[in-house]
Amino acid sequence: MSFNRTVVALSLAGVFCAACTNTSPNSDKYLNNDALVGTSIPFASEAVYFVVTDRFVDGDPTNNYEDQGGDHPTWQLPLEGPEGKKAYVGYMGGDLQGILNNADYIKDMGFTAVWMTPVHDNPDYAFNGDEPITYGGAFKDGGKTGYHGYWATNFYQADEHLVSDNLSVSDYTAKMRKHGLKSVFDIVANHGTPSFTMEKDLPGYGEIYDKEGNLVADHQNLAPEDLDPKNNALHRFFHNYPDLVKLSNLDDKNPAVRDYLINSYLYWISQGADAFRIDTIRHVPHAFWREASDRIREQNPDFFMFGEAFDYEANNIAQHTLPKNGGVSVLDFPMQKAMVSVFEKPLESDFADLENVLYLTHGPYNNPYELTTFYDNHDMARINATDNGFINAHNWLFTVRGIPVVYMGSEIGFMRGTAEHAGNRNYLGQKRLDQAKTHPIQQALTNIANVRKTTVALQRGVQVNLELNGHRAAFYRVVDTKGAAQTALVLLNKGDSAEAFVINDFMQSGEWVEQLSGQSKTVDQDDALTTTVEPNGVQVWVREGKVTSLALRDQIKYQLARQ
């Protein structure tokens, strides 16, 4: 693209965000009653690229520790599937250096932040308890390692597979910022490691160490009901009942546990975390997250957090977003489910199926514009879409309300349709990234992601739907505040033939500029904007300036009053 949108858009973003400082992430109270905006939180301007760090790129082979584990090795550990297919439950070599080496690749695609799986230290052995995991299996941990980072033995220490002699976690975050990328850290409160049913009690499993390396808790390979917290201090970090598979169940009611965890979160902020993704948030009571968010935001008022509540019922996951429960955003699972339904078979589906999950009015969320939106991740099957299905999914994801999140490799359709132990988390690698820029999915993603990156209305604007029907979608995104005023008209076509659009509703006179092509149209008063959108295409027409349509202003106020 030769059209340069950066100067105007960044100046608007800078003015707008200047008004955002020192405000609660879930508060728009500083705005006057005439302001038209979906959300004012600073993080709304971000687009997130998600990596399972060990499976991204091996940037430093010296930290692979291929001989680690002895009789319980940790390197690769393939699961054999049909027709030569494989998945892996051991370490594959990815590290922070691998992410840093590809910072410009990620930034150039249009992303502004990288969410990485937890950096915490994990056990140095494959787990020898539980039933053995097999290709395509689930909810079994036998034979697996903590390559993913979610089995922490020390919540304050980085795993040796991720850092390098010349690249600590704080070094990494500082260098990523120099590349224009924020760092989203993955945190856990529900559990530690798999902790019981081991044939032999292996070092690290069931154990938790403090910041100084002192042992503060040990499950001692005992079933939860056999723990004796009254007489054994090392058992007091745990509930005496199970939760997820054979993982230790951390006792969030214990003040020592709460302090240990929350202080670890504050520590990682000091090491450069810009936001948190919270694992298994619904497995920990709201009271814990209220205390955690209060303590975090006391020192970091604008700190953004979003949780994984793996539930497709909006009323259930929305409870986490309420201020009384900590005001934590969530991954938008209801939209994820709808996106898979629509974009796996775009020629057979209807855009109307996405309307209800937007919850633009009468919804349960504290603010739907602050949800993190996605179509797949590492805990579910990757979307089984064609290249055009991916392209249409991205065109939707980067123009509708919410903060988009894309899982590594999606830009090339990597391992499409595969679940966790069937290839979903397979190693991506530098070679694939080096070839990615010629892939049609990556090229189309780069175009629309960079439009969002430079268009304030797509980041924060109120969404006003005009048409969601069949292969066609048309909607406005509108910002009109003291600091920024911009209207974006989004037109989507997921069909295999061109679609003509004639937009009369809420149309405003003035110059409209299409952001992907640079084409300009001047619309006179009472005229329509007429255009044709190519198959599997998107157009984003932007008008700078305050809203002049009283009908549009009234519609936005109506929606915001009923949000």
PLM regions and their residue ranges:
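Short acidic/polar active-site loop segments enriched in Thr and Asp
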Residues: 112, 274, 404
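Conserved, mostly hydrophobic/aromatic
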Residues: 51, 106, 116, 155, ...
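Bacterial N-terminal signal peptides that target proteins for export
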Residues: 1-8
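Active-site-proximal beta-strand/loop segments in catalytic clefts of secreted hydrolases
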Residues: 52-55, 117-120, 187-190, 279-281, ...
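C-terminal motif of bacterial Sec signal peptides marking the signal peptidase cleavage site
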Residues: 17-19
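Substrate-binding/active-site clefts of carbohydrate-active enzymes
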Residues: 40-46, 54-271, 291-300, 304-309, ...
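Active-site-proximal helices and loops of the catalytic beta/alpha 8
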Residues: 30-31, 173-175, 180, 191, ...
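Bacterial signal peptide processing site
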Residues: 21-23
